């Protein structure tokens, strides 16, 4: 195998490993729901939006014939669906959860109808679907910025997950390089905000470490 082939194979494996590691951080929430038989302060929307994101990128991977995208987003969609079902089972507000799920499901079905029925040209469909997935991914990476501002204000990293931060940073970096190797801006560009927010989170962990965070909360009580 040539050096370029080895590098591509290694990069593909890194994308799969780091991204599945990022998705599996939700297993701690799943165990918490099973142990406490409640959802406590666990947020539902990230599970739902990540599932939609996985399904979108899965479709893009199928159209592009990219095995790495297909594997990662198939497993990701299965995991997120599992988290959604567990949340629905333990949530006391089942009506609100079902309403949010049905709304995004309807949007997803409309999107599939548009891309597969109204855009017959394969290349145009691939470009438009890639653009949609890119914009959706960027919005997901940028959505926690308000929480980051609150962390700076309170000097507390309590609401941040260090393992998720590392997994997101590694995943975003590997996908950006992967997209660059494929000359696919729809893969490269949306992962750049993930690298940026990942570095910001690491800086916050360095500036407000868990030990200092605990002392700060004790002083506030």
From Swiss-Prot:
Give the record's GO CC terms: endomembrane system; Golgi apparatus; Golgi membrane; membrane; plasma membrane
Q: Where in the cell is it found?
A: Golgi apparatus membrane; Cell membrane
Ranges for the region named Mediates interaction with TRPV2 are 149-221
Topology with respect to the bilayer: Multi-pass membrane protein
Q: Which GO terms describe its molecular function?
A: glucoside transmembrane transporter activity; sugar transmembrane transporter activity
Q: Which InterPro entries match?
A: SWEET, SWEET_rpt
Q: Which residues cross the membrane?
A: 3-23, 44-63, 68-88, 102-122, 129-149, 160-180, 186-206
- Which cysteine-cysteine pairs are annotated as disulfide bonds in the entry? none
Sorted keywords for this record are: Cell membrane, Golgi apparatus, Membrane, Repeat, Sugar transport, Transmembrane, Transmembrane helix, Transport
Key word Cell division present = no
**One Pfam match, by short name?**
MtN3_slv
A Gene Ontology biological process term: carbohydrate transport
Sequence ranges assigned to domain MtN3/slv in this UniProt record: 10-94, 127-212
Name the predominant localization: Golgi
Whether Aminoacyl-tRNA synthetase counts among this entry's keywords is no
Return the PANTHER family for the record.
RAG1-ACTIVATING PROTEIN 1, SUGAR TRANSPORTER SWEET1
Entry similarity comment: Belongs to the SWEET sugar transporter family.
Quaternary state and interactors: Interacts with TRPV2; the interaction probably occurs intracellularly and depends on TRPV2 N-glycosylation.
Its annotated function is as follows:
Mediates sugar transport across membranes. May stimulate V(D)J recombination by the activation of RAG1.
Specify the protein name.
Sugar transporter SWEET1
């Amino acid at each position: 195998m040539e050096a370029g082939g080895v590098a591509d194979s290694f990069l593909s494996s890194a994308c799969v490993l780091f991204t599945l590691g990022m998705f599996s951080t939700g297993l701690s929430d799943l165990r918490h729901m099973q142990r406490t038989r409640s959802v406590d302060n666990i947020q539902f929307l990230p599970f739902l939006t990540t599932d939609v994101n996985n399904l979108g990128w899965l479709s893009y991977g199928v159209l592009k014939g990219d095995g790495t995208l297909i594997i990662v987003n198939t497993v990701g969609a299965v995991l997120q669906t599992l988290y959604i079902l567990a949340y629905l089972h333990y949530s006391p507000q089942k009506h609100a959860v079902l309403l949010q799920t049905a709304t995004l499901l309807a949007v997803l079905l409309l999107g599939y109808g548009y891309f597969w029925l109204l855009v017959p040209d394969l290349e145009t469909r691939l470009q438009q679907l890639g653009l949609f997935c890119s914009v959706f991914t960027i919005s997901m990476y940028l959505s926690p910025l308000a929480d980051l501002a609150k962390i700076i204000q309170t000097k507390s990293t309590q609401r941040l997950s260090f393992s998720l931060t590392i997994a997101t940073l590694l995943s975003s970096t590997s996908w950006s390089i992967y997209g660059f190797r494929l000359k696919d801006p729809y893969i490269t560009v949306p992962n750049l905000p993930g690298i940026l927010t990942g570095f910001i989170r690491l800086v916050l962990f360095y500036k407000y470490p868990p030990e200092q965070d605990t002392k700060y909360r004790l002083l506030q009580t």
